[in-house]
């Protein structure tokens, strides 16, 4: 590897990404020829569009995951938006559930809470963050590609104060 801080190559020939960036990997064949391959290492992060009031049906509230990544301890950090397109302040979401599925539709992580406390005023949106501990992950963080995962978020009717 031209830059060992970006990517390294094992003795068996496997390329391992170290940190985000670009580098070149040179391979010397048994016949003496050299092959050069450009390698691009991308961070294991999911990012999507944030939910807005205009995306939410009138007199309803909406939930949407817009960011996910692994922290330094291996926990999956998920950020989501709550958009309140109704009169009254939302104070909690009963039975909040976030499910993370990989590209093969297998559940790799989930988060459940019977009552998740929020504070979203009428016709406003707000961002919230939860952390799914690495002990709750169904696979190791090295085997989960967050960029290709699908996120499902749901909750029962949120409690509102008028």
Question: Language model features by range: what are they?
Answer:
Residues 106-147:
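Short, solvent-exposed, Trp/other aromatic-anchored flexible loops in extracytoplasmic proteins
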Residues 76-84:
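Short, well-ordered beta-strand segments enriched in hydrophobic/aromatic residues
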Residues 46-72:
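Low-complexity, acidic Ser/Thr/Pro/Gly-rich terminal tails and inter-domain linkers that flank the onset
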Residues 47-50, 132-162:
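Surface-exposed edge beta-strand/loop patches
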Residues 83-122:
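The feature marks short-to-medium sequence segments in extracytoplasmic or secretory-pathway proteins
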Residues 1-45:
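Extracytoplasmic soluble-region selector
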Residues 10-11, 61-67, 111-116:
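Short structured motifs
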């Amino acid at each position: 590897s031209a830059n060992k801080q970006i990517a390294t190559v094992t003795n068996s020939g496997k390329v391992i990404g170290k940190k985000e960036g670009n580098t070149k990997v040179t391979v010397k064949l048994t016949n003496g020829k050299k092959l050069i391959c450009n390698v691009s290492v991308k961070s294991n992060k999911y990012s999507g569009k944030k939910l807005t009031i205009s995306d939410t049906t009138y007199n309803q509230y909406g939930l949407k995951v817009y960011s996910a990544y692994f922290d330094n301890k291996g926990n999956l950090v998920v950020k989501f938006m709550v958009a309140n397109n109704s009169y009254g302040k939302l104070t909690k979401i009963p039975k909040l559930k976030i499910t993370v599925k990989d590209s093969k539709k297998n559940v790799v992580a989930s988060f459940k809470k019977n009552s998740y406390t929020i504070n979203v005023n009428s016709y406003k949106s707000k961002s919230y963050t939860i952390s799914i501990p690495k002990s709750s992950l169904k696979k190791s963080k090295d085997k989960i590609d967050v960029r290709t995962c699908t996120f499902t978020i749901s909750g029962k009717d949120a409690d509102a104060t008028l």
